[in-house]
């Protein structure tokens, strides 16, 4: 039956039917296979990115609240503290103290800058402030009399 139907068709009709069959197969493959797979991959990549973002946020929160240890320092604590002090426009001098500690020479600086510097040292690098002594030096300034640091154990 199909053979006789096909035999009755002219060459141009056979070409049109063959072209429509190929086109139909292409549309089926695109809409039935490729597009769903592409959508599936995009959704899962988006989900994976959200999970990575959530994990990073959780690690940051845990680190901020002291629930996770800090990564090992890649440079000496003295270099880190001096670099961060420079970012906060603090002119400080550090000396090596007893038991792997660092001490600061007395310096007068804006309270806000000192506060940011100490917060960065603690939160970002896990540097422990062992001793802090200061006096008020004027309008929103303090004089650091004594300050000693050590790396978190």
Swiss-Prot record:
The chain crosses the membrane at residues 17-37. GO terms for cellular component: plasma membrane; type II protein secretion system complex. Keywords: Cell inner membrane, Cell membrane, Membrane, Protein transport, Transmembrane, Transmembrane helix, Transport. It is a single-pass membrane protein. The keyword Transcription does not apply. Residues 1-16 are cytoplasmic. Induction: Silenced by the DNA-binding protein H-NS under standard growth conditions. It comes from the Bacteria. It holds the Pfam family T2SSM. InterPro entries: T2SS_GspM (IPR007690), T2SS_M_periplasmic_sf (IPR023229). Residues 38-153 are periplasmic. One of its GO terms (biological process) is protein secretion by the type II secretion system. It is found in: Cell inner membrane. The keyword Cell membrane applies. Inner membrane component of the type II secretion system required for the energy-dependent secretion of extracellular factors such as proteases and toxins from the periplasm. Plays a role in the complex assembly and recruits GspL resulting in a stable complex in the inner membrane. Provides thus a link between the energy-providing GspE protein in the cytoplasm and the rest of the T2SS machinery. Type II secretion system is composed of four main components: the outer membrane complex, the inner membrane complex, the cytoplasmic secretion ATPase and the periplasm-spanning pseudopilus. Forms homodimers. Interacts with GspL. Interacts with GspE and GspF. Belongs to the GSP M family. Part of a cryptic operon that encodes proteins involved in type II secretion machinery in other organisms, but is not expressed in strain K12. This is Putative type II secretion system protein M. It comes from Escherichia coli (strain K12).
